């Protein structure tokens, strides 16, 4: 019997992009963000648009209760390799497209039950906007549809090499062959619904599953995807 076993495991991680190398600023801003949510022990990927003192940055993140796992290849790639820190491939550039239409719902605080469709009135400090993006056309390879304030409803298929990213739920009325990322920003209650699942990757609130690990019984089937109580992805086949 072999003494070594290789198994797949879904990992919940977050990506942090730095546009500054001022570690005092980074500490202050990250501390404010971390105080607003439950991020203790979160595994993070480091991305940066500027040069960094990588070892010092890693130590800073650890001191804030985060677990740096790797860097995105680019500015920090050579420095990471020099200290034998993992390097992940850089993203392929995608074309961010505009949705066919958007609907904005305004929820007044503290009465979260009262919602109305936004016309042209400016938001006040006591209102929260939830935006639903609708897109009628096929999402082609190299295209990205993003909604960071709500849900996405795609009324067509998506090709391999495309992606859909929403802070809320995602509904796709067609075949899914790209990357589908719901709950971006950590919204664990987000869900994914699609008509035919052949995705390269699905993710909810940082917990992801790649194509090879998607349960076979839901491939090419209508599927509902959500996080269970253990924060694991559940794939529920739908009867349509």
UniProtKB/Swiss-Prot annotation:
Q: Which domain of life is it from?
A: Bacteria
What Pfam family is a match, any one? MinC_N
Q: Does the keyword Transferase apply?
A: no
Swiss-Prot/TrEMBL GO biological process terms: cell morphogenesis; division septum assembly; regulation of cell division; regulation of cell septum assembly
Q: Which Gene3D superfamilies match?
A: 2.160.20.70, 3.30.70.260
Query: What InterPro entries is this protein classified in?
Result: CAP/MinC_C (IPR016098), MinC (IPR013033), MinC_C_sf (IPR036145), MinC_N (IPR007874), Septum_form_inhib_MinC_C (IPR005526)
Alphabetized UniProt keyword annotations: Cell cycle, Cell division, Septation
The UniProt function text for this chain reads: Cell division inhibitor that blocks the formation of polar Z ring septums. Rapidly oscillates between the poles of the cell to destabilize FtsZ filaments that have formed before they mature into polar Z rings. Prevents FtsZ polymerization.
| Quaternary state and interactors | Interacts with MinD and FtsZ.
Q: Which family does it belong to?
A: Belongs to the MinC family.
What name appears for this protein in its UniProt entry?
Probable septum site-determining protein MinC
Taxonomic classification:
Bacteria, Pseudomonadati, Pseudomonadota, Gammaproteobacteria, Moraxellales
């Amino acid at each position: 019997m072999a003494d070594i076993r290789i198994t797949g495991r879904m990992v919940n991680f977050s990506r942090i992009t730095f546009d500054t190398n001022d570690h005092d600023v980074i500490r202050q801003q990250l501390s404010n963000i971390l105080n607003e949510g439950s991020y203790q022990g979160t595994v993070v990927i480091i991305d940066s648009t500027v040069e960094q003192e990588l070892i010092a940055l890693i130590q800073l993140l650890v001191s804030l209760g985060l677990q740096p796992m790797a860097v995105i290849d680019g500015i920090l790639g050579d420095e990471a390799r020099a200290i034998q820190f993992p390097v992940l491939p850089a993203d392929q550039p995608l074309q961010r497209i505009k949705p066919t239409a958007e609907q904005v719902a305004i929820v007044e605080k503290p009465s979260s039950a009262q919602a109305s469709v936004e016309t042209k009135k400016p938001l006040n400090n006591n209102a929260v906007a939830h935006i639903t993006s609708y897109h009628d056309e096929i999402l082609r390879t190299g295209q990205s549809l993003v909604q960071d304030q709500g849900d996405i409803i795609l009324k067509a298929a998506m090709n391999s090499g495309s992606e859909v990213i929403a802070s809320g739920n995602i509904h796709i009325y067609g075949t899914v062959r790209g990357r589908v990322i719901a709950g971006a920003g950590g919204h664990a209650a987000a869900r994914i619904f699609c008509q035919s699942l052949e995705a390269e990757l699905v993710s909810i609130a940082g917990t992801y599953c790649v194509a090879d690990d998607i349960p076979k019984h839901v491939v090419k089937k209508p599927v509902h995807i959500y996080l269970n109580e253990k924060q694991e992805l559940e794939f529920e086949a739908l009867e349509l």
